[in-house]
Amino acid sequence: QPDIPQNAGNIGRTCVAVGAKLWFVRPLGFRLDDRYLKRAGMDYWEHCEWEAVDDWTQLTERLAGHRMWLLTKFADKLVWDAEFERGYVLVFGRESRGLPESLREEHAARCLKLPMHEQVRSLNLASTVNTVAYESVRQFGGLE
């Protein structure tokens, strides 16, 4: 549920780089044909496999059977302590609000966070996606 098209564009570029599918959960803070989205994704956007769903319920239904890690600053477990395997789904919230509390509660055992000093409320969404995506690639031993 990104609010900022530039973040979504950068996330799309990261997805292309690591071979991941990008899911958007509506409502979005921009239109999917937004010029800022395309500019941030550069010419990689045409190579990005993506899909949009109407809400979190629809996303969890579509991803039933997939193992997930959810990223939230409210998690107890650090990203570095998680085991990633190919086929896992990484779920991130929106810049302004993060993941819905109901989703965090439902999947509490699957929630992870990046460490940060208490003076920082949150990290940039695109930076967080990039960091976690490449930690998973590192654990896989590289790209396929």
Where on the chain are the PLM-derived regions?
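Post-transcriptional modification and biogenesis factors for structured RNAs
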Residues: 1-144
